[in-house]
Each structure stands twice: as C-alpha cells, then as structure tokens.
Amino acid sequence: MVCPAPRQPMSPRARAMRIAMDVGRSHGFMVSDRLIWIDLEMTGLDPEENVIIEIATIVTDSDLNIIAEGPNIAIFQPEEELEKMDEWNVTHHTANGLIDAVRESDVSNATAEIRTLEFLREYCEAGQSLLCGNTIGQDRRFLRAHMPTLQEFCHYRSIDVSSVKELSSRWYPKEKGFAKPSGHRALDDIKGSIRELAHYRESIFK
C-alpha cells in the first residue's frame, strides 16, 4: 500500500485567497487573484459635466506581477468638451501632449470601452477581478457614467492605493514613503501605482 505524500502547508497568502474564494462561492460570486488596473485622464472632476480623454489598462496577479498590458487610448473629444477644462488641466495636458493626442485621435469613447473590454476578457472573468488604482473611486465614477459596461465587468470591490498611502503615513510614519512621479498620462500613472503598492507591500505589509 502506497501512502500519499503529506500535504504541504499553505502559505498565509494562499490560505487567505482560498478563504476569499470559498466566501465568494457561498455568496454566489467569485473573486479572482487577477487585478484590473485602470487609469483615466479626464477634462475635470465631475462625471456629469466632464469626459474621459485617455484610458489605460493593465492586468496583474495578486503579487503585482504584470500579466498583460492593455490598450492605451487617447479618446477624441470635440472642442466644446476641451473648452470645459480648467487652468490646471489645460496646463498639464498641454505640456504632456495629451490635448494634441485627443485632437488627433479617431477613437470614440464607445470604441475605447469596447477595445478595453476585449482586452480584459482575454485575461479576466466578468465580475471577478477587483478594480485597482490611485483614488480609484473617482475613476469608477467616470466609468459608471461614461463606460458602464466596463465598470460592470469589474468586481464591485476596489483596491485604492491612495488609501494605503494615507493609512501608512498615519500608522507607520517612520516608514519611507513613495514618491510617485506623474506626468498625468494614463499608462505611466498606472505603472506608478503598481510600483507604489509594491513598495507598501514590502515596507508595511511584512
């Protein structure tokens, strides 16, 4: 009689993921270990008055390893929408070239949403991957208003890197913070957010 090999103990991270999946099954939904990172650039802060002018997407695993880099899209908007930008947006989006990219783009908001969803469906199941980013609640507000199908594709839970930053500065003030450079272009901002969360994982979540 051959005895089965002893089962290896699960790591804390694997055990936590198993618990999350079991909870998901018991409630009729699943939580994937794949994370959806989205960053938007907008003409302002109000989703009822302003529009999206750039979107970028990355999928990582739960250890923040990049699995795939999605489309980085400047979205065409008419001049009447660009004219709604305040001085801050005009200054920064002129300097980083985004306004020119928007004017030259032939991609509509609807097409940008479709392309992003096509990318995500290759790597994620609908409703199973958390939406991640810096101040991601603001991005979700714009997605809900302007790209609702994409917003619904993401799990309703989020990982907000800005919240981790604020808590770490208050609870662990002696730990070195993370200086995230930002040119206010969507893809660069996403990559910076991933690096920032990786920094807190190594320095805070030990």
Predicted regions and their residues:
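Short, flexible loop segments at boundaries between secondary-structure elements
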Residues: H155-P173
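Acidic, Mg2+-coordinating catalytic module of metal-dependent nucleases/exonucleases
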Residues: G127-I136, R140-M147, P173-K206
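Amphipathic alpha-helical interface surfaces
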Residues: S108, A112-T116, D139, H146, ...
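Conserved non-catalytic scaffold segment of RNase H-like nuclease domains
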Residues: D22, H27-I38, M42-L131, G177-K180
